[in-house]
From Swiss-Prot:
UniProt xrefs under PROSITE patterns: IG_LIKE
A biological-process GO annotation: adaptive immune response
Residue numbers spanned by region Complementarity-determining-2: 69-75
Protein name in the entry: Immunoglobulin kappa variable 6D-21
Residues spanning the signal sequence: 1-19
Chain segments carrying region Framework-1: 20-42
Annotated Ig-like domain residues: 20-114
Chain intervals for the UniProt region annotation (Framework-3): 76-107
Subunit-structure text: Immunoglobulins are composed of two identical heavy chains and two identical light chains; disulfide-linked.
InterPro entries recorded: Ig-like_dom, Ig-like_dom_sf, Ig-like_fold, Ig_sub, Ig_V-set, IgV_Light_Chain
Key words of the record: Adaptive immunity, Cell membrane, Disulfide bond, Immunity, Immunoglobulin, Immunoglobulin domain, Membrane, Secreted, Signal
PANTHER family reported in the protein's UniProt record: IMMUNOGLOBULIN LIGHT CHAIN (PTHR23267)
Function: V region of the variable domain of immunoglobulin light chains that participates in the antigen recognition. Immunoglobulins, also known as antibodies, are membrane-bound or secreted glycoproteins produced by B lymphocytes. In the recognition phase of humoral immunity, the membrane-bound immunoglobulins serve as receptors which, upon binding of a specific antigen, trigger the clonal expansion and differentiation of B lymphocytes into immunoglobulins-secreting plasma cells.
Length: 114
């Protein structure tokens, strides 16, 4: 494996019609090295309270829930993963990144379902 770990981020786009909520993540892609602190942001087009969840997905695997309701930890998920935010602005933080954290990360809202 190369010295730098590649972490991919997905941009989630929901058509903004009839009050539907658009989630925008940044950055789209980031190349980082082990032990770095990584921050991923997710912005909602309107307030969703704390109804924001973070997922990790590795190739050929199903998405894994990392954080629920903005900041609630999930049993079995390493403590280096944490979430914060409310309303429209949310953050996923990975402290002291490890090689096994190379994956796609994305946010999902449950405030308004199709």
């Amino acid at each position: 494996m190369s010295p730098s770990q590649l972490i991919g981020f997905l941009l989630l786009w929901v058509p903004a019609s009839r009050g539907e909520i658009v989630l925008t993540q940044s950055p789209d892609f980031q190349s980082v090295t082990p032990k770095e602190k990584v921050t991923i942001t997710c912005r909602a087009s309107q307030s969703i309270g704390s109804s924001l969840h973070w997922y990790q997905q590795k190739p050929d695997q199903s998405p894994k829930l990392l954080i629920k309701y903005a900041s609630q930890s999930i049993s079995g998920v390493p403590s280096r993963f944490s979430g914060s935010g409310s309303g429209t602005d949310f953050t996923l933080t990975i402290n002291s990144l490890e090689a096994e954290d190379a994956a796609a990360y994305y946010c999902h809202q449950s405030s308004s379902l199709p």
